[in-house]
Amino acid sequence: MSLLLTLIALLVSLLLFMARRRHGYWQRRGIPHDVPHPIYGNMKDWPKKRHIAMIFRDYYTKYKRSVYPFAGFYFFFTRSAVITDLELVKRVLIKDFNHFENRGIFYNEIDDPLSATLFSIEGQKWRHLRHKLTPTFTSGKMKNMFPIIVKVGEEMEKIFSAKTTTGEGQVLEIVDLVARYTADVIGNCAFGLNCNSLQNPNAEFVTIGKRAIIERRYGGLLDFLIFGFPKLSRRLRLKLNVQDVEDFYTSIVRNTIDYRLRTNEKRHDFMDSLIEMYEKEQAGNTEDGLSFNEILAQAFIFFVAGFETSSTTMGFALYELALDQDIQDQLRAEINNVLSKHNNEFTYEGIKEMKYLEQVVMETLRKYPVLAHLTRMTQTDFSPEDPKYFIAKGTTVVIPALGIHYDPEIYPEPEKFKPERFTDEAIAARPSCTWLPFGEGPRNCIGLRFGLMQACVGLAYLIRGYKFSVSTETQIPMKFVVKSILLSAENGIHLKVEKLSK
């Protein structure tokens, strides 16, 4: 018994020594950092007390005037460098991208094919896949998908019309309604499905989609292992996604491919582009083609990323417009003016002409970047001419987008909603890499133009026909779901919606 206790004591002592050794890295280098918790590192307040984006935002604010271009941080036992210098941000994302190509997050293409997305995969596989998928999001492809978005926008307008009356305000939870719009758009464009979630809030496509975002296969310690030690988790053959979620999307993609190949149907959407690459792979052209599992993963991330980010952005935009009626009126005037030039019809060219609408969306994404921090893994020692910029191989680099977006030296009065920050002149006057809701550089979001187009069309339909204002149920100031990685409103966004007379 005494021997067992001795062994346990030795093991605990060894673990504590290793933890202290890991947590002493930044101190040994003389890099400024907060004192880490013995177990949680600098993550003690997440996910129960503070949103992870707020932790990084405060870190940026605290250390931005340091003589070093980054501050030390510990994600449990993993060392990270939180970048506080814009020049280093630019080098990480663009100039010295070869040192920081990968995100260092979990994927397991063999056991968990849904996880092997363009967002997560690494190295040569990522480069090849990015090259193959880039033509899918050209202006021509966007224009081809535009009628699908407009059709769903019309359906959303009908739902709002049924829920409101002229001259009277009706309090509605906005995020759920616009999420059903984005689900139907992406269901059509990515899978060729009429999801009908606008008519049926409990449509399987949406409920499974929400589960794909929220639910994890294991939870607890294994989740910590997956997010903290992705390479080890891959060797242990762990999986991120719930089995019935994987089965659902696998079945949809398989049935969609089989149907379109059998009927030769062309819808000029995202799935058409993927099927073209699938046919090349089946014909033996692996250089230009995609396997079924590769198509499955990309269709999955297209839905998950577009569904959550666009609907959240639309919800936050309507929230800000409800708080400022002058901005809402100015936006409505622009929408009506442009539509009058296009026979009161929504056209691809007309949406491109709505510059103030674009500025509203961009300012929304400044205040509420859905993914409010970026991560990169240091592939090789980063040893520039100035030794204080040195970042060792294996260090996770964190770019605190929310901190940069709220830096008063970059955006004066950052708490205020000012769409004019995003005129061409204002953008040109700011340093680069100061607006990061879609990342920047070679690994930026490949679908950013689609996401912006989807949000702009949806907002144009709503602002044209409805007045949004705050109610007693509106949460002011905004509170976020602290346990989520993404920025999302706690308990939704409740606004008073009034139908406007035509």
UniProtKB/Swiss-Prot annotation:
It comes from the Eukaryota. Its cofactor is heme. It is found in: Endoplasmic reticulum membrane; Microsome membrane. GO terms for molecular function: heme binding; iron ion binding; monooxygenase activity; oxidoreductase activity, acting on paired donors, with incorporation or reduction of molecular oxygen. InterPro entries: Cyt_P450, Cyt_P450_CS, Cyt_P450_E_grp-I, Cyt_P450_sf, Insect_CytP450_Detox. Its EC number is 1.14.-.-. Heme binds at C445. GO terms for cellular component: endoplasmic reticulum membrane. Keywords: Endoplasmic reticulum, Heme, Iron, Membrane, Metal-binding, Microsome, Monooxygenase, Oxidoreductase. It is an enzyme of class 1 (oxidoreductase). It is a peripheral membrane protein. Belongs to the cytochrome P450 family. May be involved in the metabolism of insect hormones and in the breakdown of synthetic insecticides. PANTHER family: CYTOCHROME P450, CYTOCHROME P450 6A16, ISOFORM B-RELATED. This is Probable cytochrome P450 6a23. It comes from Drosophila melanogaster (Fruit fly). The lineage of its organism: Eukaryota, Metazoa, Ecdysozoa, Arthropoda, Hexapoda. The gene is Cyp6a23.
